[in-house]
Amino acid sequence: GSLKQVPRNRTFISDCLHDVCAGQFGDFDSLHPYLPGATSTTGFNFLYEPLYFYNAYSENSDITPWIAESHIYNAAHTKIEIKIRSGVEWSDGMPWTAHDLVFTVNMLKANAPELLFSVDMDKWVDKAVAVDSLTAHITLKAPNPRFVFSYFTNNFDNGIPIVPKHIWESQDAKTFKNLDVARGWSVVSGPYSMVMSTPEQRFYDVREDWWAAKTGFHALPKVERVIFLPRREESKRVQNMLANDLDICGTLLPANVRTILDHNPNITTWSDKEPPYGYLDWWPVSLGFNNLEEPFNDPEIRWAINHAINRQQLVEIGMQNAGDFTVLPFPDFPVLKKYTDRTEELLQRYPVDSFDREKTAEIMRRKGWAKDEDGFWSKGGERFKIVIDIFAFMMDFTPVLVEQLRQAGFDAGFRSTSDAYTRMSSGHAQAFIFGHGGSVRDPYFTLRLYHSQFVQPTGTPTPYFWRWQNAEFDRIVDEMGKTDPADPELAALFHQALDVWLPNLPAVPLLQFYHRIPHNQTYWKNWPSAENPYINTAYWHKTFMLLLLGLEPAQGRAEQVESS
């Protein structure tokens, strides 16, 4: 069928972030939500609605019940009863029930370890049953007071897509494409359905029969059509924003955001037209190492590298003052600061923020290194090399970091290659810069990234690749995992964990991370901002639907404004 006419001023146009959609959509014939790396977040991330949404940016860090009405744990945090809202429907008119939730959990369990979240479901879930169409019971293998928040509350990249049992039960979950526009697939619960998908573009049109509009739970979005275009290099993204051919694009380097703000008066950011030109993401970055390999397996060497780094200069020169540095691997969200603000005594004993080349030199000499005629640390005729693997979006501050390391005597350099992530995951990257997709509400999730359960030998990929192991740290983190976030004991355990982590310094914290995403107000207004933080604006996150529900048209429907 041919597409209906939708005016530009009722259309929302985005680019795409992932490698799979660089240049064109490599996944144009698929909308599979659980294939690692093979599916771009241009659909499944906002069309499978969650039990709950979480907003780390609102004053109270709100949790909003969506498909769930409520849930309750037993006292031991080993059993959960989940109540489903009545009147929720799939896009083919079938009711959305507890059977869909239970089917999804069991399907993932049965397909471990290949599918995303399958290992987690296999690890945690003893059994999941639907007691009736609106009640699910989940029995866990071990206490987990965060289970519903970790897996069924959409925030950032977190949250398991829940799929319709009546479609998926007859399919092979590992190979099902889940896309056939003529058949009305993908069957989803959200307010849009896919009407076109080609290597060049993806179109979604609003569904007048969305369950939330029918039941009065939420009005239909004003955005009538959503278009995704493939990823282009950053200069092309800038041109398309200036020409109003995009309403939003992937995060940009500070200089490029400035160019856009200077040349298109209709464009703003989360922080309006001021630095940091965006919002704090959940992903503070650190300089990491393959801690299994020499010389980085020595904590003193890691401290020597730490003392060579001037974080203030990384911000001032590298990020053109559009950011903040960090000495801990946690994002500065208000709800986390009640933990990180109480670390002064620890940071006095373990002064991560001490830029001190003399201290670097003292450690290096004690370890048997001496400076050669060019001023680089050498031992047995070999220089101390640090080659740092990075991503293109780190090109602003990395050269500054490398120069600091060189001035302190390390033979440092960096490279940004298309296989950077693979190199990090496998451990072939000896040094790298990466972020922490961890804590957004309490410190457990970030510390868990350093648990030895994720350590794989060099050559074997792992999703969390800090490659450090410490039995005492593991024990404390396991205890944190069983502790309710509301329990004051969690703060004491956090302190104990850092008391092991800091002297070992398995990675060197560098910077808070910002999403510098331009918001084009030519066709759409009521964008989220620091003043109105109803959700963050990363369209690849699993909260993108809330942005689409919040946007308001900037023009009357019939207005035809030249895009210039």
Q: Model-predicted segments: where are they?
A:
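Gly/Pro-rich hinge or "lid" segments in bacterial periplasmic/extracellular proteins
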Residues: 42, 48-49, 53-58, 155-220, ...
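Extracellular/periplasmic solute-recognition and catalytic clefts
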Residues: 108, 115, 127-128, 195-205, ...
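Detector for C-terminal structural segments
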Residues: 16, 39-43, 198-202, 206, ...
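Ligand-site clamp/hinge motif
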Residues: 85, 180-181, 210-261, 402-403, ...
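Short, well-ordered beta-strand elements
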Residues: 9-22, 69, 79-82, 104, ...
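Surface-exposed binding/hinge segments that line
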Residues: 83, 119-171, 522, 530
